[in-house]
Amino acid sequence: MTRKEIEEIVTEIANPVVNKHSFELVDVEFIKEGSSWYLRIYIDKPGGITIDDCQVVSEEISDILDKEDPIPHSYFLEVSSPGLDRPLKKESDFERFKGELVEVKVFKPIEGKKIFEGELVGYKDNKIIIKKNGNELMEFERDKVALVRRVIKF
């Protein structure tokens, strides 16, 4: 079974649990770090996720994973908040964080640059749109973008 297939199965398992608590399932990752595998489930809610929220979701999902056993080897389960500088992946993320400062990293340089910062204007027709320097609009084809994340300045 591939990583992608495991992530899809776990997403199907996690969605009802997360929705039951009125949280948002932000992402599911199944990755290998060193010699260990990690199943990471990121959840969020307006106002932010607490440790207690993570614990409740972790326990419920762990019980289901133990019964259904969709992962053929050992792993560590982690449930957490995606953090303030969370990557934006879904169309709903782009809508939710419209008007906020974001960083866009592209795979190949555009005019010699791979990182762009600006106000998120939106997501339309598979393009991410930001406003740089107050009013200069830039559009990025989604498949040419490696990462979009919020920029948090203190």
From Swiss-Prot:
Xref: SUPFAM superfamilies: YhbC-like, C-terminal domain, YhbC-like, N-terminal domain
Compartment annotation: Cytoplasm
CDD domains: YlxS_C
GO biological process, one term: ribosomal small subunit assembly
Pfam families: DUF150_C (PF17384), RimP_N (PF02576)
A GO cellular-component term linked to this record: cytosol
Keywords: Cytoplasm, Ribosome biogenesis
Main location as per UniProt: cytoplasm
Entry function: Required for maturation of 30S ribosomal subunits.
Family the entry assigns: Belongs to the RimP family.
Designated name of the protein: Ribosome maturation factor RimP
Lineage: Bacteria, Bacillati, Bacillota, Clostridia, Eubacteriales
